[in-house]
C-alpha cells in the first residue's frame, strides 16, 4: 500500500452533474425515433435479425426492440423511497429496505453516469443490470444486495457442491416473466430465504452471499443463456449424479493355486500371424480415420452451435455464478507453476460456473451459456469488454482493464495495478490522501441471513422435489416427511420419454429396521434390500422375487453371528448356507429336502484345509449324508503329491436296541486310498469315525429344524416391518425429542423445588439415627435413649476431631516458625539481601498463619459448645423421642445448669 501523508491533506470538492449530458442524450433519442419512423416495422425486424446473424459472436445487441437502449435499465435519480408504505408493514422490514442513505444515493448517481457513458461508447451493447427495485420497490445497487454470511451447518461451511445443491433445493426456481428484457426486481437474499421462490438473479445473489461467507471468490454473472437453461428444462439432460448402488459381496470359496515350481515348458508357436498382424494394421488405420472424421464432425457441430436458433437466441437474460480460482482477493491458497526460467510464478486466474437453479458445476466451456455481459461481487461491478464467440475464450484476470471495465475505482489493494518505473517502489512512494478519495462500495443493506434448523432439515419447499431427466426420474423427500422414511427414489427407464421403467432405486433413513436401500428390477421382478449394521438378526441384505417359490438370498454380517453364517440361499427343494471364519473350518452346507420341507434327502458339508498351526483330528474336505441311500461319504483333502483324494464310504448299519452298542461291520465300509503308502486305518479307528458321523447326523437333523424356524422368523419379521414401518430419532434431535425434553425439564424443576424445600426447613439432626426404627410407630425409652446418645456422641466426636486437627496444625506452624528464626539468627551474615528478605517474609507469613489458626481454634471451641447445647435442646424437645418423665426432667435440669 502507498503511504498516506495526512499533513498534505487538502479538501477536495467534486460535484457530479446528472444533467451535464441531458441535451446530448435528448438529441440522440430524437435521432433514433426519426430513423425508426422512416422505415416500416417488417424491414426493421428483418434488418435486426440479419445484423444478429452477422454479429453472432459479439455481445453488442440491443436488449429491447422498440425502446431506445439509453432508457433501458435507467436509474431514477429522484431517489424515491417508500417509507409510508412499508414503515409499519406486516413484514417488518428494516429501514434500510425502504430508504436510501446519502452514500447509496451517491452510488446510484455514479452508477447512472457509468451506464450512460457505456451506452454512448457501445450503443448496440446489451443493457447492464446495475440497480433494480427490491421487495420494497426501492432501487438498490446490485453490489450492495450481496450479504456475505457464514452458516453453522457443516454442509454449508466449505463445500461448493453442497452449498450449490442446497440453494437449488431450498429455493423454488421461477423463470423471468420476460427473459428478453431486464428483470423487474431483485429482492434481498434474506427475503428470498423466507419466500423460498425466486428468479435466477435472486438465486445467484443468495448463492454468492453464501459462497463468499464460506471463503470462496464468487461473483454474480449477468449474461445470455440458452432457452432450456432459463426454463430449467432437464428433459434432454442425462441423470448427472452417480447412482449409489450398494452391492453385496458374493461368497467365493478359496481356491488354492497349485504350485508353479515345476511347470512344463510350452510348445513353440509355429503358426503364422501375418494375417492377424495385417488385420490389426487395417483396424488401427480405420480407427485413425474414424477419429479424424469424428474430429471434423465435432468442429462442424461447434460451428453450428454458434448459429442463432431463433431471433431471441442472443437476448434471453439469465444470471449464474462464477468462482474465480486464483483470484487476487481470494483467501484460498494460490496455485503456482514453474516457468521456463525456473521461477515459481502465480498461475493465471481460471473460472468455473455454477447454475443456481440446478446446483450443477461446470467448466467455462459448457454450452448452456452464450454471452457474459457483466459480473459483480460485494466490492465492485465489472463489465466484460472482450470480443468472444464462446464463453470459454474469456480471460478472468479482473485487474486487466482492457478486458474488464471497473465501475468503482475504490477497490481492495489486491485489485490495483500501479504503473511505475522499474526503479520505483510502490510501498515507498508517498501519495497524497486526496488521491485515495475514490468512491467505494458501501456495506450491504440486507439483514443477516438466517436458516432455521427446521427449514434446513426440510430443505425442499414442499418437503419433496421431483425432476425428470433424460431416461430417469429423480425424486427426493425431506427426512421424516414420508411414513416409511424414504428420502430419495430414482427410476431408470429404457426410453428417453420415461414410459418404460427399468430399475428403481429407493433410499431410506432413520428406520428402526435399519433398512437403507431397496433396488427393484422390473424385467425380472426382483427386489434387493440392503440394511445397516446393528440388527438383532445381523441381517445384511435380502434378494427375493415377488413369487415366493423362486430363489431367495439372505446375506448376514458373519462377524456378529454365533454360527458365522454369511449367506443363505433358499430354494423350494434345497437350502444352501455359506459360513466365514468358523473354528471347525466349515464354509458350506447344503440341505436337500422334500418340497414339503419335512424330510431330509441329502446334506453336503465342505471344509477348508487345516493349516499347519491348526489342530484337526480329521482333515475332511467334503462330508455327504445320503439319507435315502442310508450312506455317509467322507472325502478328505488332497495330501502332498497326491493326484486324487482319499474317500471313505459308510453304509449305516441297523440301529441297535436301546442300551446296546453299535456293531461294526467292515463289509459295510468302502475305502479308497489316494496314496497306497499311507497307513491303513484300523477297524477301531473306522468304528470311532462312524460313531462320530452318526452322532453328528442326529445333530444335523435337529439343526435343520432350527434353521427352518429361523428362516420363517426372518421373513415373517420383514413382512411385518414392511407393513408397519417405524422411524427412530436421536435423543439429541432438538426437533423431535420434545417429550423427552419436557420430562427432563420437569425432573429438573422437581429437584430444584426439593432443594428449596430442604433449605427452608430446619436441620433434622435425629433423622439418620431413626432409620433402624422406621417401621415402628413409637420408640421405646431404651431406643430413644440410644438414638439420643448416638447423636450427641457423633456431634461431640466431630468437634473433638476438628479441634485436634487445628491444634496439631498450630503446633506444626509454631515449630516451623521457631526453626526458621533460629536458622536466621545463626546464619544472618551469610545471606545476600534477596535471600535474607525472602526468608524474613517467609517467617512473617508463618506468624500470620499461626495467628489465624489460633483464632480459628478459639472460635471453633466456643461455637462447638453453643452448637452442642442447641442440638441437645432440640433433641429433648423432639416428640419422636419417648423419654420417661423423670429422665426428661433430669436432663432439662442438667441443660439449665
Swiss-Prot record:
SUPFAM superfamilies: Cysteine proteinases. Testis-specific (at protein level). Residues 269-306, 801-858 form a coiled coil. GO terms for cellular component: cytoplasm; cytoskeleton; motile cilium. GO terms for biological process: flagellated sperm motility; sperm storage. Residues 40-49 have a biased composition (Acidic residues). The keyword Membrane does not apply. Key component of the nexin-dynein regulatory complex (N-DRC), essential for N-DRC integrity. Involved in the regulation of flagellar motility. Involved in sperm motility. Required for the sperm to enter in the coiled storage seminal receptacle (SR) tubule. Belongs to the DRC7 family. This is Coiled-coil domain-containing protein lobo. It comes from Drosophila melanogaster (Fruit fly). The gene is lobo.
